[in-house]
Amino acid sequence: MSNIWIKGWSGRLGNNIIQLKNAIQLAVSKNYNVIMPRHKYFSKTYICLNKQIGINSKRISDPNNYFYTSDLPNIDYNRVLQILKDCFTIKDVKALDAEDLVIHIRSGDIFDKDPHPGYIMPPLSYYVDIIRANTFKIIYLIAEDQKNPCINALLKLYPTIQFELQPLEKDIRLILGAVNVVSSYGSMIDSLLLFSNNIKRIYRPSYSTILFKLESVEYIITDLDEYKESMSPWRNTQEQLDKMINLSNLQYI
């Protein structure tokens, strides 16, 4: 009898949620406990599923700290999700209006020198098409900074969009309160929406893998496969940045 041991956190919050979810899934399948480092958004450092196992019992670690874990056991996923939710510090977020929209645009380090070549962000036309195809009341935009050129371009097109650079916790609460969400690319939205009691509709690019398929949620996919191929590998060149904000491919004129 052992403890599943997350020795360290890898990357950002979205990745950390994946690490913990994977560790819990393994622990539930084996009736083990979970040891993890302190984290601002997790209320526990020890998850006890088996009282016969102590914190000083044998520890099982993973070279990837359970971020990349293949062949996860097929078990009661609802139990895994409930344990995960119990660990998260932000709870009971009130829903936004059903006709409001929250857009998350990934920015940050992928717009610096030597970015990850696989992190290709959707173009401006992706967001504009979604807005034009619907009649949303209030549109909220979430981003960590304004390095992604789509952010300022979208704000220029739609000055009434609600946007401010704010602490991560406020962004999380907006995401968890959202009924309608637009995802860009990365693990943050998929991971955070595991904790949502309000989400009904998720817009996402076709080349973005659905990490966790949520029940009773409508997924609306925009075909951006050709765009993705034309932008690979991502180098953050001026040509690529210009292509991101080119509106020649709009579906809804």
Regions found by a protein language model. Give the residues of each.
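Catalytic phosphate/metal-binding cores of nucleic-acid and nucleotide-processing enzymes, i.e., regions
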Residues: 18, 23-30, 38, 95-99, ...
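A short glycine/serine-rich beta->alpha loop
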Residues: 6-11, 178-180
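Secretory-pathway luminal glycosyltransferase catalytic domains
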Residues: 3, 34, 38-137, 149, ...
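A short, glycine/small-residue-rich beta-strand->loop->alpha-helix junction that serves as a flexible
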Residues: 8-18, 112, 118-121
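Donor-binding and catalytic core of enzymes assembling or modifying cell-surface/extracellular glycoconjugates
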Residues: 136-221
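Short, flexible loop/turn elements at secondary-structure junctions
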Residues: 10, 107-109, 143-146
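A structural signal for short, well-ordered beta-strand segments and their strand-loop junctions
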Residues: 5-6, 33-38, 102-104, 140-142, ...
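Non-transmembrane alpha-helical segments in soluble domains
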Residues: 24, 128-131, 152, 193
